[in-house]
Amino acid sequence: MLHWIRCRNKKKGIHHPACSVFFDKHGELINYYKPIIPQSGEIIENEILQEVFDNVLNSYEEKYGELPKNIVIHRDGFSRENLNWYEEYFGKYNINFNIIEIKKNTSIKLASINGNIVNNPAKGQYVVNGNKAFVVTTDIKENLGSPKPLKIEKTYGSLDMITILNQIYALSQIHIGSTKSMRLPITTGYADKICKAIEFIPQGKLSDKLFFL
């Protein structure tokens, strides 16, 4: 499972796109990677996609002796890249892939309604409509407000939404830096933390050191 996020250096106006965080199917961190070439645009260029995926696939093969058969890509926000590139790239390796957008900022609120009684939704509750969904990953006491659900959208792939939501929920519960839920899955959550330490992340090198937690 791979996530990347675009990090911005506010002082220099530079974006560091595709800072990737790579996990195996058990939720174990394999590594993270910051590309060498920064960019100023919103769309991640094909050359950077190539750099990122070449490195993460090579690292997976070195660790497990084979390439993954399936990859789930979590995007923080919108995915605007060319799907044809993904199809051609992963097609060469016979790898199935899914692209999932995870949006943490949404005005939607969920509630649990039983007759005339309205309560906060329980952690793990969700609403699905086609390839879009909202899921609650945290508990909040009734007198402290209401939880903020994550907005989930599948933009490519064959995974069903229930499997996607189960994966995202599970990944939000296994943050090693705390006994509490992280709200975000560790894919996007760790990438957020990497962005806050982006100037200390070496370019062009794979690492599994979680100093940014």
Where are the model-predicted features located?
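Long, contiguous domain-sized segments
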Residues: M1-L213
